[in-house]
Amino acid sequence: MVDARHATGQHGEDEAAALLQRTGHRIIARNWRHGGLELDIICETGDTIVFVEVKTRAAHGLTSPTDALTHQKRHRLIRAARAWLAAADAWDRACRFDLVCVTQRGATCTLEHITDAFDLTETLGGGDTSWQPW
């Protein structure tokens, strides 16, 4: 049996994937896992690979979806993206990290798509550090 929190998260990811497709993104993978790492949605738009984190919250929740994208979570997303790029041999592709915030209000939800959700130099602690090893 699926617990309520998992069902809420899955519904949010379904809504986010539909939004991305409506806005011209091509879904490559969903819930991609490598070891203990996971990427919610991997898609592409134009020549850019987009790693999308989906955060779903109830409207009455204590934290906003954007607050859930902590420094530690950003590091895990970068590690997961590196693993996917290695597995797909896609190191030469431009990449970015997006966030889709899903706020549920009863049977309806609102979605906010934030492109380039975080600055990689801030996350990696240096102005010249590239997260992709080339």
From Swiss-Prot:
Domain of life: Bacteria
Pfam families registered for this protein in UniProt: UPF0102
Molecular function in Gene Ontology: nucleic acid binding
Disulfide bond entries: none
Signal peptide: none
UniProt xrefs under InterPro entries: Restrct_endonuc-II-like, tRNA_endonuc-like_dom_sf, UPF0102_YraN-like
Homology family: Belongs to the UPF0102 family.
NCBIfam families, per the entry: PRK12497.1-3, PRK12497.3-3, PRK14680.1, YraN family protein
PANTHER family: UPF0102 PROTEIN YRAN
Protein name, entry field: UPF0102 protein DVU_0833
